[in-house]
């Protein structure tokens, strides 16, 4: 029979610490990609409204009385739906401009925020506490550890393969194109990778802010702006 100390440490604390580590890595990596994509040092993973879509879906699941796995699944669906909605709306007449992408994300995030406020206002008191707890961040176990770590490592390996192109893109779009980088394809790839990382992080732990904004800058202060170091460091 397992002792209480063993159960607390290895079945409760360590899995949650591992979840926090993986979620922090996802948000840090998504923050780096988002700052490159938008060419804005103040960009963070939530600027495109992905977390807002996840929050609306998760709160509706809580309101319907779903269990934790169902809530996480609803958050994943909401995050992915929000990501694709931003992508479609930001294309305009076939063009995919960074400014339009940013404005579309900000507007959609504001709209999701209003819906979240409405849900909290009309929900019964019995559900409000659980909703607020999810919005603040919840790292309870919902997915096997190998899935969480696999998502992070796969995304990191893919992003690391484009580190040279990211270095060139950070110098300017015209210069990157003159050196052979397909900037349109690269930006679309950055958008979907950052969106999927953010959706995964929100699904695992709810909306945890600040990490994706600050961590990339901390890594740059310590190791410079070379994305061969910034990506794994974040």
Please report, for each region that a protein language model flagged, where it lies by residue.
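Alpha-helical transmembrane segments in inner-membrane proteins
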Residues: 1-234
């Amino acid at each position: 029979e397992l002792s209480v100390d063993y159960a607390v440490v290895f079945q409760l604390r360590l899995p949650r610490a591992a979840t926090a580590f993986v979620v922090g890595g996802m948000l840090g990596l998504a923050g780096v990609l988002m700052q490159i994509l938008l060419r804005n040092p103040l960009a963070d993973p939530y600027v495109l409204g992905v977390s807002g879509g996840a929050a609306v879906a998760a709160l509706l699941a809580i309101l319907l009385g779903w269990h934790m796995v169902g809530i996480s699944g609803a958050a994943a669906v909401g995050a992915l739906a929000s990501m694709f909605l931003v992508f479609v709306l930001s294309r305009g007449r076939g063009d995919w401009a960074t400014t339009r992408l940013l404005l579309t994300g900000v507007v959609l995030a504001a709209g999701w925020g209003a819906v979240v406020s409405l849900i909290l206002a009309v929900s019964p008191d019995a559900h409000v506490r659980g909703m607020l707890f999810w919005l603040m961040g919840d790292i309870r176990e919902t997915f096997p550890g190998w899935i969480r770590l696999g998502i992070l490592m796969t995304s990191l390996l893919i992003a690391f393969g484009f580190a040279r192109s990211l270095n060139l893109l950070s110098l300017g779009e015209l210069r990157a194109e003159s050196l052979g980088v397909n900037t349109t394809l690269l930006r679309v790839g950055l958008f979907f990778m950052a969106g999927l990382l953010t959706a995964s992080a929100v699904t695992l732990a709810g909306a945890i802010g600040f990490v994706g904004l600050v961590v990339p800058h901390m890594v740059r202060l310590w190791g410079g702006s070379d994305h061969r170091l910034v990506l794994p460091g974040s």
